[in-house]
């Protein structure tokens, strides 16, 4: 490979891929191009920065220069890729272009901001860069509105509350974590958030935001409004597919790849939050780690399919942490819920009484690995 491998992106997926390639080949040319600083940080830490009083710069684990030196890479930080010429195998930015033998898209996903009037007043916390842009406003805010009661919204609501802020969480759904589990399972965390002082506005809709002399006026449905100092959008992520689309690749929700992480173009692969693997978008650390291991082998000439086991998803709400696995969002499961003072075990079974999903909390999270072994893959 005279031109080697070019990777667009510098997040967890890109870094895992680099580490796995270098374990097998110390000299193949590797080039990383990304729009950010390329410094390494742990993205899940963003859910806890406010209660821990961390600044954006405190999150940096390794600088881009240290990373390049350690793994023998060419890095191009603060560089926007504008185009991919798939036929000529060339990646282009405004001032530069790179030939590749193999190209990997690790462009991640961007935070979805609801299209309401005043949406520009909403903050997002999907990267170190985004946190850096708003850390002073968030630190100074007394009253915070979080839009979205999913995994990230619930984590942030607890964190801001632990930092002593007045927190309101709004969601269209009737319960928190509604896309992940039924209300009878999420109710334990919901009660805990309420006990802590989080004001939950469920089955409610944000209609607009407006700057005022004393903060931001949030207009809700049913002629309601509240005034806050900061509004955070936590309404989910959208895979970054614009570059792939311009390159003529097949796109659905994400960049479509097969079990080999290969796109509709034989020399282009996708990995991480931007990828849709056989119809599934899996924006969690474990599938990305496993995907990176397989893709490294395939880029170096192997033909290894990705086989994902049953995997745990961790909800980082320290006052009431949860682990879940399996098809927790399935509507047809019967839930058997065992609740004790020290925690909960909720098992979702199908009509044949086969375990299909589970959620465990607090001290009973230690039962997760035993349950995981009994889930069908």
Swiss-Prot record:
Q: In which pathway does it act?
A: Nitrogen metabolism; nitric oxide reduction
InterPro entries, sorted: FAD-bd_OxRdtase, FAD/NAD-bd_sf, FAD/NAD-binding_dom, NO_rdtase_NorW, Rbx-bd
Q: Tell me the cofactors it needs.
A: FAD
Q: Which SUPFAM superfamilies match?
A: FAD/NAD(P)-binding domain (SSF51905)
Single GO molecular function = oxidoreductase activity, acting on iron-sulfur proteins as donors, NAD or NADP as acceptor
**Which top-level group of life is the source organism from?**
Bacteria
Enzyme Commission numbers on file: 1.18.1.-
Q: Which reaction does it catalyse?
A: 2 reduced [nitric oxide reductase rubredoxin domain] + NAD(+) + H(+) = 2 oxidized [nitric oxide reductase rubredoxin domain] + NADH
Write down a Pfam family by its short name: Pyr_redox_2
The record's NCBIfam families line, in alphabetical order, gives:
PRK04965.1
Instruction: Sum up the protein's function in the record's words.
Output: One of at least two accessory proteins for anaerobic nitric oxide (NO) reductase. Reduces the rubredoxin moiety of NO reductase.
The family annotation for this protein states:
Belongs to the FAD-dependent oxidoreductase family.
| Protein's recorded name | Nitric oxide reductase FlRd-NAD(+) reductase
């Amino acid at each position: 490979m005279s031109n080697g491998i070019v990777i667009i992106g510098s997040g967890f997926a890109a870094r895992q891929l680099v580490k796995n390639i270098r374990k097998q080949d110390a000299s193949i040319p590797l080039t990383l191009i990304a729009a950010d600083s390329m410094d390494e940080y742990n993205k899940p830490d963003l859910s806890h920065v406010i209660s821990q009083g961390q600044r954006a710069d405190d999150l940096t684990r390794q600088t881009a220069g240290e990373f390049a030196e350690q793994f023998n890479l060419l890095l191009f930080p603060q560089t926007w890729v504008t185009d991919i010429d798939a036929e000529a195998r060339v990646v282009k930015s405004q001032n530069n272009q790179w030939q590749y033998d193999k190209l990997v898209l690790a462009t991640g996903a961007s935070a979805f901001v609801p299209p309401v009037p005043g949406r520009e007043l909403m903050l997002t916390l999907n990267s170190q860069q985004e946190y850096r842009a708003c850390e002073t406003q968030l630190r100074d805010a007394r009253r915070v509105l979080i839009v979205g009661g999913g995994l990230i919204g619930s984590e942030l609501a607890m964190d801001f509350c632990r930092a002593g802020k007045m927190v309101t969480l709004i969601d269209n759904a009737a319960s928190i974590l509604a896309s992940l589990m039924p209300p009878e399972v999420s109710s334990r965390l919901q009660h805990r958030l309420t006990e802590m002082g989080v004001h939950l506005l469920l089955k409610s809709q944000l209609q607009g935001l407006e700057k005022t002399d004393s903060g931001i006026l949030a207009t809700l449905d049913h002629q309601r409004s509240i005034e806050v100092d900061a509004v955070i959008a936590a309404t989910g992520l959208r895979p970054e597919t614009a570059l792939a689309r311009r390159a003529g690749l097949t796109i659905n929700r994400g960049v479509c790849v097969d079990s080999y992480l290969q796109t509709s173009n034989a020399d282009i692969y996708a990995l991480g939050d931007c990828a849709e693997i056989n119809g599934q978008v899996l924006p969690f650390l474990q599938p990305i780690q496993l995907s990176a291991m397989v893709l490294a082998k395939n880029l170096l000439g192997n033909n290894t399919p990705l086989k994902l086991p049953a995997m745990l998803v961790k909800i980082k709400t320290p006052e009431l942490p949860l682990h879940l696995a399996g098809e927790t969002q399935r509507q047809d499961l019967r839930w058997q819920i065992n609740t004790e003072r020290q925690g909960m075990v909720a098992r979702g079974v199908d009509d044949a009484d086969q375990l299909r999903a589970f959620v465990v909390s607090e001290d009973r999270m230690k039962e997760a690995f035993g349950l995981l072994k009994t889930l069908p893959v």
